[in-house]
Amino acid sequence: MGIVDYLVAAVSFRTLPTTFVAVLVYLAIFISVLITDELPATPKDQRGLNLTQAYSDLRQIAARPHPYNSHANDVVHDFILTRLQDATAGYDYAHVFDDKVSNGSWSSRNNSVYFEGTNILVKVDGHDADKSGALFSAHYDSVSTAPGATDDGMGVATLLQLVEYYVKHRPQRTAVFNINNGEEDWLNGAHAFLEHPWSNLTDTFLNLEGASSGGRPLLFRATATAPVRAFREKYVTHPHGNVLSSDAFARGVVRSGTDYSVYVDGRGMDGADLAFYKGRSRYHTRYDAVQYTDGGVRSLWAMMEAAQGVSGALLSSEAVHGDKGGAPVYFDLFGQALIVFPLSAMITFNIVFLVVGPIMLALLVTFDIVARHRRQEMIGGGYEEQGFFARAWTSFKSFRWVGGFWKHAKFWVALAVTVGLQVLLCVGYLYINPLIAYSSSHIVLLSFLSLAYLSTYLVHNIPSPTDTYGSHLPEQQKQAALFQLYFFTWILLLAATVVGAKLSVGSFYILSLWNAVLFAACAIGSIAGLLSSHTVEGDASYGSRRRIRGVRYDREGEEEGVESETAPTEVTPLIAQPITVVAPGGKEGEEVSGAIGWWFVQFVLSVPAVVILVSQLALLMLAATEQTLADGSPAVTVYGGASLMSVLAILPLAPFACKLHRRVAYVALVVLIASTAYAWLVFPFSERAPLKVFFQQQVDLDANITETRITGHPAYLRQAIAALPSAGGAPLNCTADDAKAGLQTCGWTPPPALEPSVIALDFNVSRSEGQNQARFEIAETDTRACRVYFDQAVTRFQVHGGTEGVQKGFEIPEEGVRELRLWSRTWDRTWVVDVDREGSALTGRVACEWSEYASGSLGVETRTRIPAYEEVLTFLPSWAVASKFADGLVEGYKAFAV
């Protein structure tokens, strides 16, 4: 075998070259995706920003928990205000406003709110004041159980840097900064901002959020294509975003809310959410602190870098203003580029390929068939053969049709087997260890990937027992599988186009690309067939020698590898035809190979691009959903998603599976066994990924009864509670929780030493004669948050001394509400509230909330103590961590009837 033969073998569709290319491509993609999913290093050139100062600001902001209803919140407010006043001093076009005048009322489906804001606003006048400006928003309050390093200390520290930057580099358009308070108590600070005149100066916004514990910030969602363009690599060095998260919000899959919804629904602004999303197990817990943040200072820089780039575009580029561009489709590539286009463009692209693609391929296949037939006639020399029906009957009796049928059916059989096995593996996870994805999602994904590869490889390598006529030659198998895969994606693309057009879903962009590249691969295969020299029995590249028909039908009985001549007949050529029936390469026992070079072009077209997009989407989806299980999200969503991504990552390899080395399958089998065994046997939680449970104490002030309640996943809740001394021996009352679907709440009576201090509530309720109206007078003690629960719906309310009416776009629903929340910017407030009701009777509860505790208030003077929560912090197992159940860690209440 000479050098030329070796070179030919190296580029032929053979086992070793195909396996080498496939393994190399998949490894390169997986490694690249994993590496680029990590935070990049901080650059030396910080482009006018000061990372050191920002990190120092973050440590001040996130020194301790500082919810709206805490004295620590006032400390953070004063720190931020001082920083901004110092940063803007001496610049007459920069204005700071400590907004302690904006009050408002608004409603949602279940409750109404009256809120008194303490936002800190900054306005930097642009050179072109006549043009609409841009709003930049973050909230400085945290939840009561977390210092708020990522939620939302990093966002606030970033805005402080942007203010300093734009004060020194005056923008073209006006920049408005809303560093708001009360977001954690359901977006109250953003609502208060809408009451301020500066909210009318902007037509677009960027909201900075943190729904996790760091990592790379993600373009969570966007209103239209225009604001997404501000995230392109032209402005943002390391863009990161995917339309999947936006679609998840729009469909209600993500059960969360940000100020984004207030700006969109209340003012109709265009804009985007930029938020952290990894490590949700530490979100809203004591681990949302500076020292526990994923990536630390690099995470902070990632948000600063992205926010600076986006803000620069929003304040200068006309492309992100004016024409909205409709619903967007966007995704990043390795954190280096952001691909963005309107959903309408994708729908048009899909329709074109749905119509043109099949027609073009049908024409190419027809031309190929006609060309083959003409060659057969030329080779046959015009001699008569058996008729069509006679040949068909002969083929049927000899079961030759089975081989052809199996060649086209094996893709669908492999797909069915793969889906079936994936379902079984999902069921195994759900029954054996349903929460293992919480801490080991990459192991779970590895098991699904290895199973998908095994099932695809094994089925595609099952031979047909009647395949003695070359119907399973590798080139033909590949081309048949490519066409089956194209048809499969065509069906998916048709469904995706209908759904995408009706529901404005852009996450199907992978199907658009997949169908297009498969069209190209199938077309190249057909064109290669037209250009190649074919024989009656197969492609000349498979090593067959041409025969005239009379000789061909005299071959029966020849053994493979035996060189012979046919007996002479009246149609035998004058020159003898020596024939060796061997595999390509000319030696007995060598494997059958395909055409030189074309398979590689088809592989490069149909595999890498799809696998890249699927791999990135898989990591994003797992990172965003794996730890939502503690919030009550169904586990089938996580495992079903991992399974789907695995199948989509392996399916592009199906046409080439017949030429993959069996040793890769051995490796996949070992990986499957090891990863599945690990995932089914290991405890699902750790100190790195702790199970989140939710704490609240409720105090019945009428009966003087206190109950400690902890809510969590029912499979592990009792095990976590058993570690608490106060729960030892106490009867537990455990019920399904209505507020957090899928979770369970267990309550018990704590000893007197663990009852909260300074829990006092005085109120009076009276009825107006002749009217269906009641007046509540509520006196707070060491709190600024109270609420009223109604057993009967109320249709109107008015807080004395507050603003009249309800915010536009957030009116009380026609059926009324059954809860009224009252938030005061001052302490120990006495509320006077009038409410209208439908019927004559009105009953319910008046309650106040407390959120401060000793260890969370170090350095801040407060009288409130919650020893039961201190017990939870001290004795909860290391694999569990506590978060707040509601706005208040303690709720004290009294009943009323009028």
From Swiss-Prot:
One of its GO terms (cellular component) is vacuolar membrane. Glycans are attached at residues 50, 103, 110, 200, 704, 733, 764. Residues 36-342, 433, 501-509, 615-635, 686-898 are vacuolar. Its EC number is 3.4.-.-. The chain crosses the membrane at residues 15-35, 343-365, 412-432, 434-454, 480-500, 510-530, 594-614, 636-656, 665-685. InterPro entries: Fxna-like_M28_dom, M28_fam, Peptidase_M28, PFF1_C, PFF1_TM. The keyword Zinc applies. This is Vacuolar membrane protease.
